């Protein structure tokens, strides 16, 4: 049977959900093919969304019309702002989720979205015509034809689950791997490598001894992810903290020879920032203990996820390890930890739209591109879906810059640098992180969302009013001169503020940590009518004024530099500071400008600086 649609999405994980929902929302006829409809939106690993860098991604996905934020706000068990005591640029919203509620909410959203149909089957191969994808075939002999195909297969491509010496061809424990599609992608000439990730054991909640464990609460004023969420007052559950100990470590050391990670059984490279417990014991042998979080998987607290204990050790060793830990002496393991090894395609095979360079109309998103994490997958799925629709409409692609969004940083890192280990987002990856805060996501991306038809007009108008109020009042504060007069000193004293000794502007005064919203309204009467969102932005802009201005200057400098043309006869060979790889790629692609050079995978900002210098020297000579 042959079925037709505009866009096919393969895989119903976090990338596939966003890709299919956004494409349908933008008016395309979308069909989602997934192995099991019941597992759409399943959180395969930890029961949490957000965190440092990841919270930024989730909020960006939300502003651009995505679903992850609203699903999380409707399924969370605990909400916190991480790094709350630090600056706003490095704070991250994180939520523990009820895995069942999240999955069911996501599935129902997908099944009830207009323009979006779903079928339960396995995609086996792509159909190509003249190096352009036109459809797929499935394991039940269905043929689906479409103008665009988005592959979001997660860990299922030639997936192998490892628990001790035991191996099985699974994409997730108990679910079949996608071997035919994996072979098809290799045959098409994509650069395929292997990666490894893992998950932690789960234990029965009624078998844990919580007495004596440190209780970890959610925030009193819980933060939420979606700007559409109203009247947020969720029921919050506690997590609990326990630790490994020298006995735990000795059990693991005694069984290193049985660990797939060390025996040579696993070839794929694992995540640097989420190592297994056996890897931690091996690499950090001097540490006497490692922190573990016991996280409820559902509102019923029937199972707890042991965060920090990712492992692929044999079953009997996992039992001993868990029973050596305080609070878990009599714990009943409901699900064992395991490692999973899988195929991924080097993301340097992609353009910034996430379309493959090799095959027109084929987009890749999520772990197939070498990333790890639900949020990274969701961000890619969203961007692939948007760009597939824009291509259908013959409209310009939607590419976010590194100075606009963490999504821009994520995709630029992937397609220009590639990866040889699971890529995870951190705030440290962004050069302009002071400009890319969670709190200003709406202001950064609202205009894009509205232009794409993904934000309501009335809300956008209010947002623009707020944006205008921020700029006008910052200008007014900069021009507002304060001198240490009796009146000014008296007013500062009444607000329990230190006096000023010299002439200052309003921005300098608001840069003080102690100058909160209440004091802002009291001291500067023109700020009194402003809403909390506007006041928060004014406060942050004042506090980091010098650094924010510097970052804007750097962006302007970079934008100016990227406009520089490269002479047709420019010789790249022999320029000090350019690696052999950079020279080879520049000679091969012959970019016409530094911007085109920046789009070539492997060309770094340092390479661009060197090129800029030598182009300038050549002009002057």
Curated annotation (Swiss-Prot):
It comes from the Bacteria. It is found in: Cytoplasm. NAD(+) binds at residues 270-284. GO terms for molecular function: flavin adenine dinucleotide binding. SMART domains: GIDA_assoc_3. GO terms for cellular component: cytosol. SUPFAM superfamilies: FAD/NAD(P)-binding domain (SSF51905). One of its GO terms (biological process) is tRNA methylation. FAD binds at residues 11-16. Keywords: Cytoplasm, FAD, Flavoprotein, NAD, tRNA processing. The keyword tRNA processing applies. InterPro entries: FAD/NAD-bd_sf, GIDA_C_N, MnmG, MnmG-rel, MnmG-rel_CS, MnmG_C, MnmG_C_subdom, MnmG_C_subdom_sf. Its cofactor is FAD. The keyword NAD applies. NCBIfam families: mnmG_gidA. Homodimer. Heterotetramer of two MnmE and two MnmG subunits. Belongs to the MnmG family. NAD-binding protein involved in the addition of a carboxymethylaminomethyl (cmnm) group at the wobble position (U34) of certain tRNAs, forming tRNA-cmnm(5)s(2)U34. This is tRNA uridine 5-carboxymethylaminomethyl modification enzyme MnmG. The lineage of its organism: Bacteria, Pseudomonadati, Campylobacterota, Epsilonproteobacteria, Campylobacterales. The gene is mnmG.
């Amino acid at each position: 049977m042959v079925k037709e649609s505009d866009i096919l999405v393969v895989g119903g994980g976090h990338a596939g959900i966003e890709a299919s929902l956004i494409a349908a929302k933008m008016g395309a006829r979308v069909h989602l093919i997934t192995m099991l409809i019941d597992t759409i939106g399943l959180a395969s690993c930890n029961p949490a969304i957000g965190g440092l860098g990841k919270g930024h991604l989730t909020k960006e996905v939300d502003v651009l019309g995505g679903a992850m934020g609203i699903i999380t706000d409707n399924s969370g068990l605990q909400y916190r702002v991480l790094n709350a005591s630090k600056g706003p640029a490095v704070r991250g919203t994180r939520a523990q989720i009820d895995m069942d509620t999240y999955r069911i909410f996501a599935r129902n959203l997908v099944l009830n979205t207009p323009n979006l149909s779903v079928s339960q089957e396995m995609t086996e191969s792509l159909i190509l015509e003249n190096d352009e994808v036109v459809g797929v075939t499935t394991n039940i002999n269905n043929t689906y034809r479409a103008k665009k195909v988005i592959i979001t297969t997660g860990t299922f491509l030639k997936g192998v689950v490892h628990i001790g010496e035991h191996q099985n061809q699974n994409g997730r424990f108990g679910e079949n791997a996608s071997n035919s599609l994996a072979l098809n992608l290799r045959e098409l000439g994509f650069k395929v490598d292997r990666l490894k990730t893992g998950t932690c054991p789960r234990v029965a909640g009624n078998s844990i001894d919580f007495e004596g464990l440190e209780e970890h609460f959610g925030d009193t004023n819980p933060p939420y992810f979606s700007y559409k969420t109203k009247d947020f007052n969720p029921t919050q559950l506690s997590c609990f903290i326990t630790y490994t100990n020298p006995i735990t470590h000795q059990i693991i050391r005694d069984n290193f020879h049985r660990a797939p990670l060390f025996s040579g059984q696993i070839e794929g490279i694992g995540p640097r920032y989420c190592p297994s417990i056996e890897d931690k014991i091996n690499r950090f042998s001097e540490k006497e203990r490692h922190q573990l979080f016991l996280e409820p998987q559902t509102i019923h607290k029937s199972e707890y996820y042991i965060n920090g204990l990712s492992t692929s050790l044999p079953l009997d060793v996992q039992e001993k390890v868990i029973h050596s830990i305080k609070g878990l002496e009599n714990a009943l393991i409901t699900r064992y930890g395991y490692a999973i090894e899988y195929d991924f395609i080097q993301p340097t095979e992609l353009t910034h739209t996430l379309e493959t360079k090799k095959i027109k109309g084929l987009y890749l998103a999520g772990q197939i591109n070498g990333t790890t994490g639900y949020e990274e997958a969701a961000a890619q799925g969203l961007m692939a879906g948007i760009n597939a629709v824009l291509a259908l409409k013959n409209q310009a692609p939607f590419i976010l810059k590194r100075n606009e969004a963490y999504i821009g940083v994520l995709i630029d890192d992937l397609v220009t640098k590639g990866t040889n280990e699971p890529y995870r987002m951190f705030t440290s990856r962004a050069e302009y992180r002071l400009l890319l805060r969670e709190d200003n996501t709406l202001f950064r991306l609202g205009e894009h969302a509205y232009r794409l038809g993904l934000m309501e007009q009335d809300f956008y108008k209010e947002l623009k009013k707020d944006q205008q109020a921020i700029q006008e009042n910052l200008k007014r504060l900069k021009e507002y001169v304060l001198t240490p007069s009796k009146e000014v000193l008296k007013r500062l004293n009444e607000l329990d503020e230190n006096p000023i000794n010299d002439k200052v502007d309003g921005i300098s005064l608001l840069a003080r940590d102690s100058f909160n919203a209440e004091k802002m309204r009291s001291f500067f009467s023109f700020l009194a009518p402003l809403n909390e969102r506007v006041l928060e932005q004014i406060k942050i802009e004042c506090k980091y004024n010098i650094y924010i201005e510097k970052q804007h200057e750097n962006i302007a400098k970079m934008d100016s530099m990227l406009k520089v043309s490269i002479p047709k006869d420019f010789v790249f060979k022999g320029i000090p500071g350019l690696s052999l790889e950079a020279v080879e790629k520049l000679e091969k692609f012959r970019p016409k400008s530094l911007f085109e050079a920046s789009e070539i995978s492997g060309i770094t900002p340092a390479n661009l600086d060197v090129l800029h210098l030598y182009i300038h020297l050549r002009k002057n000579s």
